[in-house]
């Protein structure tokens, strides 16, 4: 009996942290959510932009068959019908081609994965691969799942089978999230169908998974399923590599379910991160208070989290809430994103949105009939045809390279004016200064950088020989003078050794 207990403990220890490594190619550290993009457009973006600019990877929208909903809202992608790989984003062949092309340029693919539930209960119809479904009888022959494969009144004790009491952990995990048919993940058959789907994606070459609604699943069920996942495709990643798993756990405090229950499995999404930074960069909390940003603010360990300013849900006022900054407020949004990318806390994810009417938060991606529009690229590298593409804003993609260059370097040389002007360095690799105050910043600061002329990667870029924006001269003593107008569209300056005149341009 004792040997069995010891063996079980060893399995738990072996699993802990196994799925927390983002599996980026060397020198890359940031992923971007290309929300509702087609697979063909993602493949092109990997080759023409993400690879050359040092991005680690792409979070893609759920690739499995989903319910067809009138007017095609974005959230139909989060109502599975089967695990067939056919959606508005494209076919399985197009998905396979995209994954292969992105991996060839060192850009990894992370699949948004919906395994807590199927469609909403009630009604019937077909999915994006033509599979029939019936939410009245809980019949999903495309998997197949039947009524036996869902939680019932034996597991869920709310009056209508829906979640109402967020102070009741059992109800949160055993009942229906907004009337979505809740899978019985304690059942081996259900687990096997889910892991077969995830393993198929691994075999196609994905690097990992975002687990949607992880908070609504028991950690033990997730451990059991993830323990049977394949290693990553050895032709791409080498042998013995595990997929990266990051779990959507909305933990704003005050509820019985905490993110810490899931950090032993993989990473968790840190929603408080974006909410708190939003308060600072809207000038609701002094920027000087960021001097101890991270765990000292009551947030989880840096190695346990994926951090972000906004995501596809909370930019629409859905899950997570808290009024995060979004692309609708570009000035503070760029500042907050630059701070996130310059600071060592967490593994960073960017949001890449499409334009939508804020009075219609259900609005789906730019489309022509049932077809998602192509992503078109303007002369200034921004996107057209209804796509916002925050990841293509210069102030953001240049900071992706900044993060790559300074990775592993300690935060040092912190300076602030006690209010809304701050600056800090990352070892001897990079330095950033920001001014959110109501007056100009005019300071000589210690950067920690080697002497030379650096290109500010906020106001411009470095092409390997010259700067298109501001130049900053660092003296032999490491000091440099910074002048930042409080009325600037981008009141910040960032420099790093990969954008130093007289040396090659480096992004990873």
Curated annotation (Swiss-Prot):
Q: Which residues are noted in the entry as chloride-binding?
A: 210, 311, 349
Enzyme nomenclature, EC number: 3.2.1.1
The subunit field of the Swiss-Prot or TrEMBL record says: Monomer.
Concerning its family, UniProt says: Belongs to the glycosyl hydrolase 13 family.
UniProt protein name: Alpha-amylase
Q: Biological process (GO) annotations?
A: carbohydrate metabolic process
What are its cofactors? Ca(2+); chloride
* Annotated Pfam families: Alpha-amylase (PF00128), Alpha-amylase_C (PF02806)
Q: Which cysteines are joined by disulfide bonds?
A: 46-102, 156-175, 383-389, 455-467
Q: Which GO terms describe its molecular function?
A: alpha-amylase activity; metal ion binding
Q: Which InterPro entries match?
A: A-amylase/branching_C, A-amylase_C, Alpha_amylase, Glyco_hydro_13_cat_dom, Glyco_hydro_b, Glycoside_hydrolase_SF
What is the enzyme's class at the highest EC level? Answer: hydrolase
Q: Which organism is it from?
A: Pecten maximus
SUPFAM superfamilies in the record, alphabetically?
A: (Trans)glycosidases, Glycosyl hydrolase domain
Identify the stretch annotated as signal peptide in this record.
1-19
* PANTHER family, per the entry: ALPHA-AMYLASE (PTHR43447)
- Any idea which residues are catalytic in this one? 212, 248
Question: For this protein, what does the record note about how its cofactor is bound?
Answer: Binds 1 Ca(2+) ion per subunit.
Q: Which chemical reaction does it catalyze?
A: Endohydrolysis of (1->4)-alpha-D-glucosidic linkages in polysaccharides containing three or more (1->4)-alpha-linked D-glucose units
């Amino acid at each position: 009996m004792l040997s069995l207990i010891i063996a079980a403990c060893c399995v738990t220890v072996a699993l802990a942290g196994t799925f927390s490594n983002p599996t980026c190619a060397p020198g890359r550290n940031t992923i971007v959510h290309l929300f509702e993009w087609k697979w063909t457009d993602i493949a092109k973006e990997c080759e023409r932009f993400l690879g050359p600019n040092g991005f680690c990877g792409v979070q893609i929208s759920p690739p499995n068959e989903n319910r067809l909903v009138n007017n095609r809202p974005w959230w139909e992608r989060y109502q599975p019908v089967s695990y067939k790989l056919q959606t508005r984003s494209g076919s399985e062949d197009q998905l396979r081609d995209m994954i292969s092309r992105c991996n060839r340029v060192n850009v990894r693919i992370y699949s948004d994965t919906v395994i807590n539930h199927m469609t909403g209960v009630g009604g019937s119809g077909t999915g994006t691969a033509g599979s029939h479904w019936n939410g009245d009888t809980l019949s999903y022959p495309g998997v197949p799942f039947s009524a036996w494969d869902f939680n019932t009144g034996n597991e869920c004790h709310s009056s209508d089978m829906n979640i109402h009491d967020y102070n009741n952990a059992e109800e949160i995990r055993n009942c229906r999230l907004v009337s979505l048919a809740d899978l019985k993940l304690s059942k081996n058959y259900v687990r096997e169908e889910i892991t077969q789907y995830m393993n198929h994606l691994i075999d196609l070459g994905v690097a990992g998974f975002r687990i949607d609604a992880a908070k609504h699943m028991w950690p033990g069920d997730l451990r059991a399923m993830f323990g049977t996942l394949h290693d990553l495709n050895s032709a791409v990643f080498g042998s013995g590599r595990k997929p990266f798993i990051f779990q959507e756990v909305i933990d704003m405090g005050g509820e019985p379910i905490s993110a810490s229950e899931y950090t032993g499995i993989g990473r968790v999404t840190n929603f408080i991160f974006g909410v708190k930074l939003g308060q600072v960069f809207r000038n609701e909390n002094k920027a000087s208070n960021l001097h101890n940003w991270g765990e000292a603010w009551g947030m989880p360990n840096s190695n346990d989290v994926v951090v972000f300013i906004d995501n596809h849900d909370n930019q629409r006022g859905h899950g997570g809430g808290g009024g995060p900054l979004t692309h609708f407020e570009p000035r503070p949004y760029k500042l907050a994103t630059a701070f996130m990318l310059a600071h060592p806390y967490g593994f960073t994810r960017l949001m890449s949105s499409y334009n939508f009417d804020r009075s219609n938060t259900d609005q789906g991606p730019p489309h022509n009939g049932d077809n998602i529009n192509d992503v078109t690229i303007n002369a200034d590298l921004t996107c057209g045809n209804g796509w916002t593409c925050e990841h293509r804003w210069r102030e953001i993609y240049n900071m992706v390279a900044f993060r790559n260059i300074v990775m592993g370097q300690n935060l040092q040389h912190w300076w602030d004016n006690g209010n809304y002007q701050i600056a800090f360095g990352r070892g001897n690799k990079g330095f950033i200064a920001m001014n959110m105050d109501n007056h100009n910043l005019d300071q000589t600061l210690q950067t920690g950088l080697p002497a030379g002329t650096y290109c500010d990667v906020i106001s411009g870029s470095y092409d390997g020989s010259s700067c298109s924006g501001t130049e900053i001269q660092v003296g032999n003593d490491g000091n440099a003078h910074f002048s930042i107008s409080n009325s600037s569209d981008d009141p910040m300056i960032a420099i790093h050794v990969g954008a130093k005149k007289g040396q090659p341009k480096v992004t990873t």
